[in-house]
């Protein structure tokens, strides 16, 4: 997972609450397990007028010229509710700013390096007004200072310290485990053999 400190990019205002994971990436596109190639299907039902994805919906925010290069998505409350699917953060994998996120989506997103910035409802309302007054405006998200800035306005946000550390240092579940491999092996040696089998023993076990 790549390290993250700051991002400055065009912010697209998706003025909708309760956007579920099926809207983010519909179930018919979940067959692949490679993380790449999902972006074209992002918001399939909203973004296209046909199933073949050849006719764009000109009214959808990401299809408007000012937001085609957007790397930040600003949404309303309860973004990412619905079924648990890692394909949703894979499909977005840039940024989301909203008053609240569904718990399962939040865990999947942060585990895949997708930073979720949660602001108060009134702060998100203000951010929407700023973006709507200046389409294509760039917003800066700074994980070091825990701030989000649009024009002359800056808001502070919070994030679980452990999650923040993982994002800043580029740790996912695997790399974080490997970082403590020596400690894990030392713990294994202190435990009874019948309680914690060693990795080498597991490799030799018949299936």
Residue ranges and their predicted role:
Residues 1-32, 172-207:
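N-terminal, positively charged, Ser/Thr/Ala/Gly-biased leader segments
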Residues 18-19, 79-80, 162:
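Short, glycine-/Ser/Thr-/acidic-enriched flexible segments
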Residues 25, 106-111, 151-153:
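Short acidic, glycine/serine/threonine-rich loops at helix termini
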Residues 31-138, 143:
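Feature captures the catalytic cores and cofactor-binding loops of soluble hydro-lyases/lyases
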Residues 114-203:
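Acidic, glycine-rich flexible loop/linker segments
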């Amino acid at each position: 997972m790549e390290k993250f400190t700051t991002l400055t990019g065009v912010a697209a205002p998706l003025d909708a609450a309760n956007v579920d994971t099926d809207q983010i990436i519909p179930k018919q596109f979940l067959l692949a397990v490679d993380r790449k190639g999902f972006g074209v299907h992002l918001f399939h039902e909203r973004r296209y007028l046909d199933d073949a994805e050849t006719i764009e919906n000109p009214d959808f925010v990401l299809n408007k010229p000012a937001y085609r290069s957007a790397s930040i998505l600003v949404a309303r409350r309860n973004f990412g509710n619905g079924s648990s699917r890692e394909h949703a953060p894979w499909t977005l994998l840039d940024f989301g700013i909203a008053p609240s996120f569904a718990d399962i989506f939040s865990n999947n997103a942060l585990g895949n390096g997708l930073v979720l910035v949660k602001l108060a409802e009134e702060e998100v309302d203000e951010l929407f007004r700023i973006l709507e007054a200046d389409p294509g405006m760039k917003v800066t998200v700074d994980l070091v200072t825990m701030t989000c800035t649009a024009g002359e306005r800056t808001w502070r946000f919070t994030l679980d310290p452990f999650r923040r550390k993982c994002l800043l240092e580029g740790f996912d579940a695997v790399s974080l485990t490997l970082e403590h491999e020596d400690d894990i092996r030392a713990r294994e040696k202190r435990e009874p053999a019948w309680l914690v089998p060693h990795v080498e023993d597991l490799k030799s076990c018949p299936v």
